[in-house]
């Protein structure tokens, strides 16, 4: 068999992320996808919070304790001729920045909705992010094996709240204890549900034709009649699937099922492989980069410290945007201008790492990082270009970090700077004193940092309140203007972990006054990396 060309490799890639509100069942779906990709033999490993078994994709100590996905992990698996790259995103509300950046590295997204709760606040936020790039969205309405809301209601809510058209591909028959299966509107086939099959891929029974007497026999006449009546309503009130509108991010195909009961996930996966786009062109400073160009380019969207407690290492996650990675390739790190030879890139199955011989556009690889790689770094085979649109946000909460052992100050600085590189928190060093201030988007991040400083760096610390209301990165057209501002506003200025000058405002009013007094200084809420 001749090896596949780059064009063929790119055409088979599907790189997507899962977005959902916490507890909508995202981790369970991740497990089931791996089951269909033959990566795990039994998908009984996510019972999250109560049972002792832990989800395959939630591998950091703290996640194991809390049952939330705090870090984005990457999993690659084969399915029906495609190579699927799944990026798992943190489901907890505090981790929006990490999730935001992950969504810059995918070509499509799967939205998971709890059928009992409908559209929840976190999903709304994530959809706004997908909107910015018109990311195509598939929808899985989960937990049909529980008592849930009416399907038409849930679709109406998705259309109203998320402002996207819904095209149901499958439709549920019954729910809760009397959930019977789903009817596929495109193939005119009913797929029947049997309980207690959550751990393995089972053969399912299918009935062809909506008016087939076998259907009445299989689900009962009442349910069959109700399905026929409901479908008339559904087809009258909803949109038909339209590939162009889906690819433009305007319409979402909707699948119903139960991830825990291992039912319906494969229907969604079939849709993903059939309709979701392969790797797309990417905007860079100099030009747009096509996915099937022969030379390799890529950008780092995430850095994860200590993925392997045995190795005390940091891994930079890189999305390949064009070309082929081959072991030993020489790449230019555009920000520093340095050439690096990469012989030990990794691929992932949630904590299981393997050295990769080659990888293609659309794939995610891990680079060993000894402090030289930053989020947003572009790597090329020599060309001067940088991929755009990977943001840092100004934090909203601040605490002063106080060491319980003053002799550990060096380890504290190192630990905080490394953890800040991951992008979930930011560290600030005020110019006027030796304080260390930690900034975050949500309060859980402070707990995460304290736990990781202790567990991974041997640093015991506590937090104290600090009078900082908000932070802004400051820029000016000339170094002279910036230096003058630095003298005048010295008491409010700090450097962040990457050395950028930052204004820490004690109040919103103070920030407003500073902006009025210094019109030649730009106060930025986000910093493009």
Curated annotation (Swiss-Prot):
It comes from the Bacteria. Its main location: cytoplasm. SUPFAM superfamilies: EF-G C-terminal domain-like, P-loop containing nucleoside triphosphate hydrolases, Translation proteins. GO terms for biological process: regulation of translational termination. It comes from Alcanivorax borkumensis (strain ATCC 700651 / DSM 11573 / NCIMB 13689 / SK2). This is Peptide chain release factor 3. CDD domains: RF3, RF3_II, RF3_III. Belongs to the TRAFAC class translation factor GTPase superfamily. Classic translation factor GTPase family. PrfC subfamily. GTP binds at residues 20-27, 88-92, 142-145. The gene is prfC. The keyword Protein biosynthesis applies. Residues 11-280 form the tr-type G domain. It is found in: Cytoplasm. The keyword Protein biosynthesis applies. Keywords: Cytoplasm, GTP-binding, Nucleotide-binding, Protein biosynthesis. One of its GO terms (molecular function) is GTP binding. PANTHER family: PEPTIDE CHAIN RELEASE FACTOR RF3. Increases the formation of ribosomal termination complexes and stimulates activities of RF-1 and RF-2. It binds guanine nucleotides and has strong preference for UGA stop codons. It may interact directly with the ribosome. The stimulation of RF-1 and RF-2 is significantly reduced by GTP and GDP, but not by GMP. GO terms for cellular component: cytosol.
